[in-house]
Structure formats: C-alpha cells, structure tokens
C-alpha cells in the first residue's frame, strides 16, 4: 500500500534533522530544467504566472535564482513541508521506525520535483502543479510530467507488496497521476473523503479535511496499515468510517457534532 499527498506551500527550513538520511529526488534533472526556465522570469512575470503577491513573487524569484542540486540548503521534504496536512501528520511524534516506514510507503507529489520520497532533499521553492507554465512545446506542468510520475509510482506501489494506492492528495495534484490504474490495471485506487455533519447534512469542511488527511497518514504509518479493511478502522479525533456513504473507490469518514 502506497499513500500519495500534496506538498505544502508553507516551508520551514530552520529545523535540521541530522539523524535521518537525505536522498536525491528521482527527477532532479527534470526539476533543474524547470528551474532554468523559471529563472528567465522577473519577479513581476513570476507573480502573474503564479498569481502571488509582490512580496511572495520576489521571494520566489530569489529562491529560483539560488536553487542548486547540492544539499547545501536542502532539508528532507518530510521535515521542510508545513501546512494543514503536515500539521495533522505531526511528524515530530514519529519514532525512527515510523519514519523509515513512511519513507517506504508515502510519496509527495510536487510541481517542481514531480514526486518525492519523504527523505528526499529539497531547496526552498514554490511551484504548484496547476501552474500554467508553457515552454518547449509543453502546454503546462501536467504535460511536462506526463506518464513519468505514473511509472515511478507503479514501481513504488508494487514494492510495498500490496497494489493499493491511497489517494490523500488534492485533485490539482492527483490529476498528474490520473489514469495510473489504466496504465497498470492491477493498481487499485482508494480515496478517503472526510465530512462533517452540519445543518442536517454531511459536508466537506476544507481546512478540517486537510488536517484529517494528515491524521490518516499518521494513522497508516504508525500502525503499519497495509490493507483497506484496516484503513477503515481510522478513528482519530472523532472520525469514523461511514459505510452508507462509501463505495469501493471512495472511503467516507464522518465527524458528528
């Protein structure tokens, strides 16, 4: 069983974990090509491309200008990424066994790096998968990455001994690997969905759902979950599996108020 999640926009490069190894991303060469293209943009053009404020555009411009392939300014992405999903994961509560299990069973999709193992070193960056970066006959980042990510993930899924892919990524990122189960029909995709009961109906509450995704990652990694039936036992912070709302592909977990 392999889990995929989205990266975070918020980064923390102040923390250093020297007890964990730092590995090279699989698609470092492809990331470098993107960075070299983005270095051609001034901060104003970068802001228009990414729809960011002047302050953030300047920060991103500076990040791309100093980006390099060495580990000089890198952190393991599992440590560097912050945000609601990663808050829910609470990596600081993982023991060393949990962390190494996570490195084998979690993948983080990325606009710049394609797909990351948790121990992969990354430089500070921001490049969302949905960014309409058009260059060298590529229409956008989805076109750039095409099937590369799918083939990498098929290999990683099979290495776990269970052909289930647990999709805890946003649609923007999952779209980059959509059709992986067509490319390899042995792959079974399940998507956990988190809803809260409000005003007489179950609704997805975005911020809570993001945190719940992180909670589920933590649940899977700490309990070494490797099958769907055990996945349904997720019960952190009041969520429970709702069989009535679920089907074979979508596992719905609900929170009652």
UniProtKB/Swiss-Prot annotation:
InterPro entries on file: YaaA
Domain of life: Bacteria
GO biological process: response to hydroperoxide
GO cellular component term of the entry, any: cytosol
NCBIfam families: PRK02101.1-3
Family to which the UniProt record says this protein belongs: Belongs to the UPF0246 family.
Protein name: UPF0246 protein CLL_A2361
Species of provenance: Clostridium botulinum (strain Eklund 17B / Type B)
Lineage: Bacteria, Bacillati, Bacillota, Clostridia, Eubacteriales
């Amino acid at each position: 069983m392999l889990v995929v999640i989205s990266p975070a926009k918020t980064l923390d490069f102040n923390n250093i974990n020297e007890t964990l190894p730092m590995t090279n991303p699989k698609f470092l060469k492809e990331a470098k090509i993107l960075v070299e293209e983005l270095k051609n943009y001034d901060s104003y053009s970068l802001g228009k491309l990414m729809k960011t404020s002047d302050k953030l555009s300047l920060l991103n411009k500076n990040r791309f200008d100093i980006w390099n392939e060495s580990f000089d300014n890198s952190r393991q992405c599992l440590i560097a990424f912050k945000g609601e999903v990663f808050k829910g994961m609470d990596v600081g509560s993982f023991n060393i066994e949990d962390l190494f299990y996570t490195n084998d069973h979690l993948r983080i999709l990325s606009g710049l790096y394609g797909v990351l193992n948790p121990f992969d070193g990354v430089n500070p960056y921001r490049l969302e998968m949905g960014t309409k970066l058009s260059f060298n006959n590529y229409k956008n980042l989805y076109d750039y990455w095409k099937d590369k990510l799918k083939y990498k993930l098929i290999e990683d899924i099979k290495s776990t001994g269970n052909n289930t892919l647990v999709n805890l990524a946003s649609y923007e990122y999952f779209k980059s690997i959509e059709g992986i189960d067509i490319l390899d029909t042995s792959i079974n995709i399940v998507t956990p969905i988190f809803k809260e009961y409000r005003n007489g109906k179950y609704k997805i509450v975005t911020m809570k759902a993001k945190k719940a995704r992180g909670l589920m990652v933590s649940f899977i990694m700490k309990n070494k979950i490797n099958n769907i039936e055990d996945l349904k036992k997720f019960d952190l912070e009041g969520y429970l599996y709702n069989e009535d709302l679920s089907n074979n592909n979508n596992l719905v977990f609900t929170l009652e108020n």
